[in-house]
Amino acid sequence: GGGGRCGSCGGVGASTPITCDAVNGAAPTDDVAPASDNVPFEELAPHVETTFRQMEADCAANTKPAGLLDHVDTVSVARDLDVLRALSGNEKLDYLGASYGTYLGAYYAELFPANTGRMVLDGALDPSLSQYERRRGQAQGFEQALRNYVDWCQAGQDCPLTGGTDAGVQQIVDLIAAADQTPVASSDPNRPVTGQEIQTIVLLYLRLSEGSWTVLNTALNQAINQNDASTFRVLANETLSQSMVDVGVFYGNTCLDYRVEGDMTTWAAQSQELEKVAPHFGTLYEGGDLTCQSWGHSGTQPPKALHAKGAAPIL
């Protein structure tokens, strides 16, 4: 059969892409947002609304054909995937999906079970969850991953984090907060490293296996003990441009996959819940429904479980 791999597909690259202004192209995605400064949701909301309305207008003006922003949901991407399968002359689609790619693979198997070949979904997203439930789960996952990293670090050599798990977590949080106030000097004299950049790198490395965590040890050791963020500077230069999916693509796809649920009162309560269940990362995940309402292109169907009846076994 034909092979496919997807980590974050749809609306990018040599397909017909969503195109946004370069300034907005570097705007924060789902989990790369300003470091938490505990601004109440009610104060943040008008800024979110203005930002995403402007961004949508910009993306709509730069994206051809007109109307594409209403057709980049996962169901549409799955249908495109089946067209690619047919054009390549394959009876079945063999597919490896990670992250968002698991969501796409699940929808493909639901829509085209007879065309589904060998499919592996690594770390599957649950399609029956609402956008808020998904974001809450992600925030909790990062919160646990941060604790796992600190435990791993303290059990090994050359760990800059002292005390127990809570103390180690707090040292990272304090570093981020301090760098937000006064960016930390790096090997590039014109580019000290901000708390937001440190937080983003920490989040990216928490997604990786323990084999990559020694790099985080090195970066934190320099920053905490030598007030030198050179390693963070290198990591930011290397990874941020690659990992920060164009925000227009991200929200263009995500918002069409979920209908907007709740109102300002609901979202303020959810914001408080997020800060309770994920005190260090919760604020990065608040306001998803408000964002999509402001973006102006959202789904209409409630989330549902997918069963892919008739498809070959999926791993």
What is the predicted role of each segment?
Residues G1, T102, G123-A124:
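Mobile, glycine-rich extracellular loop/lid and propeptide segments
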Residues G2-R5, P46, R53-Q54, N90-L93, ...:
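Loop/turn elements at helix/coil->beta-strand transitions in domains of secreted/extracellular proteins
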Residues G2-V75:
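Cap/lid segment of the alpha/beta-hydrolase catalytic domain
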Residues R5, G13-D37, Y107-Q171, Y205, ...:
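A catalytic-pocket lid/entrance helix-loop region that shapes and gates access to the active site
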Residues K64-G67, A78-K92:
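Conserved acidic catalytic loop of the alpha/beta-hydrolase fold
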Residues R79, G97-A109:
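Glycine-rich nucleophile elbow surrounding the catalytic serine of serine-hydrolase chemistry
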Residues A167-A311:
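Alpha/beta-hydrolase fold active-site neighborhood
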